[in-house]
């Protein structure tokens, strides 16, 4: 009976632990594209305001051996199973060689792994397919970092004079 009560209590508390995980902050790591077999830098900044998660992503792409970037606003949520769901909301800036298709959006489904010395988000990404483009898939692995000066995304906000976008966390 005692084991049953402990097991029941543990099952009731697990969802509370999942939803109490702190995901705000700056995350830096890599994005692996299954199609191109390229691993490139990837950054996320997540903030929470008025009970809602939002943020920004900074991703890089190689086209013809040249590196291009895109900075996007993202919507962030935590699914019932504890997965971190990140969806593109709007493309803010890029240096793409062609005008990007407005209908392509990326979806990340990440697991939050908490270790003694680091927090990691790891999982899959997929883009939707359109008439012109097929879907892309891949893998994202990012670690929470505290050194904002090491971040290309933070340097972008500083250059734009938009540090108030990230002041919630600093």
Question: What would you call each of these model-derived segments?
Answer:
Residues 23-45, 52-59, 63, 73-170:
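Beta-sheet ligand-binding and adhesion/scaffold domains
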Residues 1-26:
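Bacterial Sec-dependent N-terminal signal peptides
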Residues 68-71:
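Short coil-to-beta strand junction motifs in C2/discoidin
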């Amino acid at each position: 009976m005692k084991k049953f009560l402990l097991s029941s209590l543990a099952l009731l508390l697990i969802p509370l632990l999942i939803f109490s995980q702190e995901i705000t902050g700056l995350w830096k790591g890599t994005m692996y594209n299954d199609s191109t077999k390229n691993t490139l830098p990837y950054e996320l900044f997540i903030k929470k305001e008025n009970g809602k998660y939002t943020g920004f992503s900074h991703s890089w792409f190689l086209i013809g051996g040249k590196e291009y970037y895109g900075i996007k606003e993202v919507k962030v949520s935590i699914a019932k199973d504890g997965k971190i769901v990140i969806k593109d909301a709007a493309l803010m800036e890029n240096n793409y060689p062609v005008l990007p298709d407005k209908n392509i959006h990326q979806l990340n489904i990440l697991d939050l792994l908490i270790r003694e010395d680091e927090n990691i988000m790891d999982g899959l990404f997929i883009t939707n397919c359109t008439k012109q483009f097929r879907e892309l898939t891949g893998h994202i692995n990012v670690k929470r970092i505290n050194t904002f000066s090491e971040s290309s995304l933070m340097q972008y906000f500083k250059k734009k004079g938009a540090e108030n976008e990230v002041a919630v966390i600093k």
